[in-house]
Amino acid sequence: MAFQVKIHQIRAFVEVARQGSIRGASRMLNMSQPAQSKSIQELEEGLAAQLFFRRSKGVTLTDAGESFYQHASLILEELRAAQEDIRQRQGQLAGQINIGMGPVFPAV
């Protein structure tokens, strides 16, 4: 049977690529570093390709990693759009709200 890429592996891969480190990605995804490393290792083994060059100061994408990153980013964006579409169809609020706040001065 062919290797099945799991969505959590795609999320882990994309975040590691964005952060440039497994440690940074682990923090962003609230995941332990060993779990993050295992997810990436399983993905690389399943794809039979090295996706990252591992260095003491982080990771960088290999050529295969660059290619997979382009596809993986699109997959995550499409998944987000599909989830938002379903929420809208169900009458739920969807989207993102940004709230800004100016300086706060204490009462005198």
Regions found by a protein language model. Name each.
Residues 9-16, 68:
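Short alpha-helical "packing" element that flanks the helix-turn-helix/winged-helix DNA-binding module
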Residues 44-63:
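A short LG(V/I)-centered, amphipathic sequence patch enriched
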Residues 14-32:
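Short helix-boundary/capping micro-motifs
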Residues 34, 81-84, 90-108:
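N-terminal winged-helix
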Residues 11, 27, 38, 53:
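Base-recognition residues in the alpha-helical recognition helix of bacterial helix-turn-helix
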Residues 19, 28, 41-50:
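Residue cluster at the C-terminal edge of the helix-turn-helix DNA-binding motif
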